[in-house]
C-alpha cells in the first residue's frame, strides 16, 4: 500500500518545463502545471514545440508583468479557447494566459509572467505554471524583446 502510494506520487510529480530563450540572450524556465490546466498547457506546449513562438515579441512590459506570444505583436492577436481557472496563485514568477473581457475565454496564443505578486488575477486568469529559474531575466525583459526558442522537457 505504501509502495503504491509512493509510486503514484512520483508518477504525478513528473512535471514538464518550458525554457524560454531570448534573442538578446538569457533564458528562464517555467514549471508547467498540466494537473491544473491540462488543455492550456497542452496548447502552450504544442505552440512552443512547433516553433510558433519563435521571433514573437514581448509587446507588454509593466512593473508587475511581461506579456508576449501575440502573432500580431500588438496585444490583439491570437485565437480563443476556454479558460481553465484554478487555485494556483499569481505570485511573482507565475505564468498565465491572457484573455479578453469574458472570463470564460482565454487567448490561445498570448501568455504572461508576473514580475511581482498579482493576487487580483487569482481565479480570474488561467495559471499554467511557475518560473523556477531566470526570474532576473524576466524582470529585465523590455518591450520588443523577441523569443528565440522555447524548449519543452
Residues covered by each model-derived region:
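Cyclophilin-like peptidyl-prolyl cis-trans isomerases
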Residues: 1-153
